[in-house]
Swiss-Prot record:
Gene that this polypeptide is encoded by: ctaB
Domain of life from the UniProt record: Bacteria
Protein name (database record): Protoheme IX farnesyltransferase
Keywords: Cell inner membrane, Cell membrane, Heme biosynthesis, Membrane, Transferase, Transmembrane, Transmembrane helix
Pathway recorded for this protein: Porphyrin-containing compound metabolism; heme O biosynthesis; heme O from protoheme: step 1/1
Amino acid sequence: MLNSHSTQSTPVKNFQNKFLVLTSTPKDFLLLMKPSVMLLAIFTAITGLFIAPNKIRPLLSLIAILCISTGAGAAGAINMWYDADIDRIMKRTRNRPTVTGKISPSTALTFGIILAFFSVLVMAICVNYISSILLLISISFYIIVYTMWLKRRTAQNIVIGGAAGALPPVIGYSAVTNSIDTTCLMLFLIIFLWTPAHFWTLSLYYTNDYKLANVPILPLVKGINYTKYSILAYTFLTVISASLPYFTDIAGLLYLICSTISGIIFLCYASMLFNDRNNILARKMFKYSIIYLFNIFLYLIIEYCIKRFIFLN
């Protein structure tokens, strides 16, 4: 009886796996694209568009943002395809659609490749080649350099891999200017320095998860205290880099005051981590780090709008 049941269930299971996409919902595909990461990419790219010296062309800017968001989603989908084995082990990621079976691995990979291809192609045709090449670099760097090469090999994975997430404002800026200069590279630097502190606070809270998945994060390789000092160092560098737009005349005094206040709060969180025995504060700092970055880029947009209003009047 047992053998007969096993034989009958196998074709059914194969049929379900083969046509799993039919049971997937739009929400599953949205989750596959890591919407929180997409939102960050979209917002920082919009900031790049705003602070560009050239006049913004609404239609091309909209196309550029759609391409950047689609490219970020493509990278997220392929990342979930590749990391499905470790996502299955970790509590934080075990409900992802590639783990629960709502989207099959082959579907996730195909979906990601199609999105990546068309996002880069449309950017090249409708916007310009520089922003298209930068988008391709960002997607490729996240998938190949970070996900496939660094993530499972070194505790410094996020330091190097963070470059991919720092490119959206550069892409947005170049979509308007068709060039790269120190202005957009400053935005790149802020996100690049912010990323390690942001991720390591999360890794402090989920250390056991990463240990089970055998992913070499900094707390496991170098220890908790070393990680906290590293978070403090990168937080300090982030706050310093966030002041650069003022000292290079990209932003004014209002930006400096607001960014400094946000930076002091960020540094306070980093300093208090040393008394955080249960890593509860680490999770709070992780959440604040997202608010901090959004605020910094929002201040730049507000500053631009104020200058634009004064100029028009």
